[in-house]
Swiss-Prot record:
It catalyses: a long-chain fatty aldehyde + 2 NADPH + O2 + H(+) = a long-chain alkane + formate + 2 NADP(+) + H2O. Its EC number is 4.1.99.5. GO terms for biological process: anther wall tapetum development; cutin biosynthetic process; pollen exine formation; response to abscisic acid; response to salt stress; wax biosynthetic process. Disulfide bonds: none annotated. One of its GO terms (molecular function) is iron ion binding. PANTHER family: STEROL DESATURASE. Homodimer. This is Very-long-chain aldehyde decarbonylase GL1-5. Belongs to the sterol desaturase family. Aldehyde decarbonylase involved in the conversion of aldehydes to alkanes. Core component of a very-long-chain alkane synthesis complex. It comes from Oryza sativa subsp. indica (Rice). The keyword Transferase does not apply. The gene is GL1-5.
Length: 621
C-alpha cells in the first residue's frame, strides 16, 4: 500500500479474493457459445484467442518467477545482494490482477473498438506500426508520466507502493495501485487501438506486443544480470533501445534516475541516466560468474507429488505458507507428474534457497527425489550417489557444514551420514544430522512438572537420545512396543534404567510419537493428551477431542536470519526444523566435530547455543 493512499488505490475486486476470475466468465462463456453455434469461418478467432493469451501470459510470468528465484538462490550475477521478507511476498501475491484487467480491456476492445473484430493472423504493416508507436508515443509518454509519479504528491499516494520493493522480483513490475495500472494499460493500448482503427491489426502482432511488454517488465525486475555484453558490442545502438536488469535496478535503489520504460534513450536525452549504470552492469556480469560462496549447505528433498509448487522456486504464494494439501492442486496432476519425471531424470541437486545470518551464508539444496523414492530399495543407491555428490560439491565450494534434512539422513540409507565420512575421511565440511538439537527441542517441549511420558512409534536416533535424556531427568518413559523396549533398554544407563518401562496401558497425558504410529494407537490416548512428534514428518492428526499436537522438532528463527520468505514444508512462517538449525549453529559456534552415525552432541550445549543466538521454542498447539 502507498504511504498515503489516494483515490482508486485498491483493486475493485479485492474482496472477491480467489473468486476474482469470475469477472472474465461472461466473455469466456460468450466465446464458447460463439464456437458452439457458429461455423468455423464465422467465429471471431481474435476474440476466442484472448483466453489462451491470458493463460500464456500467466505461464510466462510464472516461468520468470521460477527462473529468477533459482538464479538468485545461487547468488550468481545477482545485482542487489539483499534479501526479501514475507511482507513483500504478501504485497506482491496479487500480481495476476494486472492480467485480469488486461483481459477485460481486450474483451471490450474486441467487441466495441472499430476494426477490432475478425482480425487476420498476421499483418507486417501492423507489426511495424506497433513497433513505431511503442518506441515513440508510448515510451515518451511513459517517461514523463513516470517522472510525474515521482513528484511527492503522486509518489506518496500511488507510486510508493511499487517502490516498497527495493529488492525486486519479476512480478514486482506489475505491483501498482489500481489507478496507476489503468493508466499504464491505456498507454500500452495506443499501438493496439491505432492498428485497429487503421485496419492493420492482427492476432499474432497483438500477442507478440503483449508478450514483449511482459518479457521486458519481468527481465527488468528479475535482480540478476542476463543480457550478454556481446550484444552491445555487436550492435552499439542497442544500448539506447533496450534496458538491462541492472539499469532498472538502479531506479529502485536510487529512485531519481533511470525513469525509462524499456528504452534508455529517453534517460540519455533528458540527462536522467544514473552515472553508475555501465559500471553496475559490467560488475554484475564480471564479478558474479561463480556461484556465491557458502558456509552451510542444508540438503532437503521433495516430499509429496505437489510439494514442488510449495518450494521457494515454485508458486510464491504457496511457498510463503505452510504446506497443506489443496483440492484444486489435484487438477494439476499432469503437470505434477511431468515435474516428477523431469526431477527424476535430473542428475544433481539444485539450490532452492539462500539465507544469511551474522556473516554466515547458507543455502538449501534439494535432492531431486520425492519421499516415496526413499522407500524403494532399487532407488537407494541412486539417492546415495546424489547425496554424496552434493556433499562433495559443498565441500569443494568451501562449505563448513553440510546438514542432512528429512530422509537424507535415514539410518537405513547412509547410517545418518556416516557412510560419506567413512568414504571421505579427509572431508573438510562437517556432516550434521541434527539429532542433538532435535532431541533437545522435544525434551524442552514437555510441559514443566511432567513426571511420565509415553514413547510410541519407530525408535529412531532422536527417540534414543530423548529417552536417555528423560530417564536421566527421572521422568518415567513408558514404551508401547515390547520389541522396541528390549532394543532400547540396554542403551539406558544402569543407574536410571528403571525409568524406562513397557506397558500397553500407559496413562500419561504426554505422548512422544514418531513414524509408524497408527491411528488406532492414538485413540488409546486419554482426552487432553499432548502429542509431541520426534519424527521428521508430522503425524496424522486423528484426535480432535481436546487433544493437541506440537509441530515436528523446530524453532522460531531470529530477525538476524535474513531472506526468509518461504515456509519450510509444513512449518509456520519464520520457523525452521531443528535439523536445519543444527547445521547453522555448527557454523556459528565453529564446532569441528561431526554429528553422524551414532554420534550425538551434548544436548544441553546445543540447546544453550540455540537460545543464545536468538532461536526460540515454538508455541505448543
Amino acid at each position: 500500500m502507498a504511504t498515503n493512499p489516494g483515490l482508486f488505490t485498491e483493486w475493485p475486486w479485492k474482496k472477491l479474493g480467489s473468486f476474482k476470475y469470475v469477472l472474465l466468465a461472461p466473455w469466456v462463456a460468450h466465446g464458447w457459445y460463439e464456437v458452439a453455434t457458429k461455423g468455423r469461418r464465422e467465429v471471431d478467432l481474435g476474440y476466442i484467442a484472448i483466453l489462451p493469451s491470458l493463460l500464456l501470459r500467466m505461464l510466462h510470468n510464472q516461468a520468470w518467477i521460477t527462473i529468477s528465484r533459482l538464479q538468485n538462490a545461487r547468488g550468481r550475477r545477482q545485482i542487489v545482494r539483499r534479501g526479501i521478507e514475507f511482507d513483500q511476498v504478501d504485497r506482491e501475491r496479487n500480481w495476476d490482477d494486472q492480467i485480469i484487467l488486461s483481459g477485460i480491456l481486450l474483451y471490450l476492445g474486441a467487441l466495441y473498438v472499430p476494426g477490432g473484430q475478425h482480425l487476420p493472423l498476421w499483418r507486417t504493416d501492423g507489426a511495424g506500426l506497433i513497433a513505431l508507436l511503442h518506441a515513440g508515443p508510448v515510451e515518451f509518454l511513459y517517461y514523463w508520466f513516470h517522472r510525474a509519479l515521482h513528484h511527492h504528491f503522486l509518489y506518496t499516494r500511488y507510486h510508493s507502493h511499487h517502490h516498497s520493493s527495493i529488492v525486486t522480483e519479476p512480478i514486482t513490475s506489475v505491483i501498482h495501485p489500481f489507478a496507476e495500472l489503468v493508466a499504464y494499460e491505456l498507454l500500452f493500448s495506443i499501438p493496439l487501438i491505432a492498428c485497429a482503427l487503421t485496419g492493420t491489426a492482427s492476432i499474432i502482432a497483438f500477442e507478440m506486443y503483449l508478450i514483449y511488454i511482459d518479457f521486458m517488465n519481468n527481465m527488468g525486475h528479475c535482480n540478476f544480470e542476463l543480457v550478454p555484453s556481446w550484444l552491445f558490442t555487436w550492435f552499439p545502438p542497442l544500448k539506447y533501445l533496450m534496458y538491462t536488469p541492472s539499469f532498472h535496478s538502479l531506479h529502485h535503489t536510487q529512485f531519481r534516475t533511470n525513469y525509462s520504460l524499456f528504452m534508455p534513450f529517453y534517460d540519455y536525452i533528458y540527462n536522467t541516466m544514473d552515472k553508475s549504470s555501465d559500471t553496475l552492469y559490467e560488475n554484475s556480469l564480471k564479478n558474479n560468474d561463480e556461484e556465491e560462496a557458502v558456509d552451510v549447505v542444508h540438503l532437503t528433498h521433495l516430499t509429496t507429488l505437489h510439494s514442488i509448487y510449495h518450494m521457494r522456486p515454485g508458486f510464491a504464494e504457496f511457498a510463503s505458507r505452510p504446506y497443506v494439501s489443496r483440492w484444486y492442486m489435484r487438477m494439476m496432476w499432469p503437470l505434477s507428474w511431468l515435474s516428477m519425471v523431469l526431477t527424476w531424470t535430473y542428475g544433481s541437486s539444485f539450490t532452492v534457497e539462500r539465507n544469511v545470518m551474522k556473516k554466515i551464508r547458507m543455502q538449501s539444496w534439494a535432492i531431486p527425489r520425492y519421499s516415496f523414492h526413499y522407500g524403494l530399495d532399487w532407488e537407494k543407491e541412486a539417492i546415495n550417489d546424489l547425496i554424496e555428490k552434493a556433499v562433495c560439491e559443498a565441500d569443494k565450494n568451501g562449505a563448513k557444514v553440510v546438514s542432512l534434512g528429512l530422509l537424507n539422513q535415514a539410518h537405513t540409507l547412509n547410517k545418518s551420514g556416516e557412510q560419506y565420512l567413512l568414504k571421505y575421511p579427509k572431508l573438510g565440511a562437517r556432516i550434521v544430522d541434527g539429532t542433538s538439537l532435535a532431541a533437545a527441542v522435544v525434551v524442552n517441549s514437555i510441559p514443566q512438572g511432567t513426571d511420565q511420558v509415553i514413547l510410541a512409534g519407530n525408535v529412531s536416533k532422536v527417540a534414543r537420545a530423548v529417552a536417555q535424556a528423560l530417564c536421566k531427568k527421572n521422568i518415567k518413559v513408558t514404551m508401547t512396543n515390547k520389541q522396541d523396549y528390549h532394543l532400547l533398554k540396554p542403551e539406558i544407563p544402569e543407574t536410571v534404567a528403571d525409568n524406562l518401562s513397557f506397558s500397553k496401558t500407559g496413562t500419561a497425558k504426554v505422548w512422544l510419537i514418531g513414524d509408524g504410529l497408527d491411528s488406532a494407537e492414538q485413540f488409546r490416548a486419554q482426552k487432553g493428551t499432548l502429542f509431541i512428534p520426534y519424527s521428521q514428518f508430522p503425524p496424522k492428526m486423528v484426535r480432535k477431542d481436546s487433544c493437541s499436537y506440537s509441530t515436528t522438532p523446530a524453532m522460531a528463527v531470529p530477525k538476524t536470519l535474513q531472506n526468509v520468505h518461504s515456509c519450510e514444508n509444513w512449518l509456520p512462517r519464520r520457523v525452521m526444523s531443528a535439523w536445519r538449525i543444527a547445521g547453522i549453529l555448527h557454523a556459528l559456534e565453529g564446532w569441528n566435530e561431526h554429528e553422524c552415525g551414532d554420534k550425538v552432541l551434548d544436548m544441553d550445549k546445543v540447546w544453550s547455543a540455540a537460545i543464545m543466538h536468538g532461536f526460540c521454542p515454538v508455541a505448543q498447539g
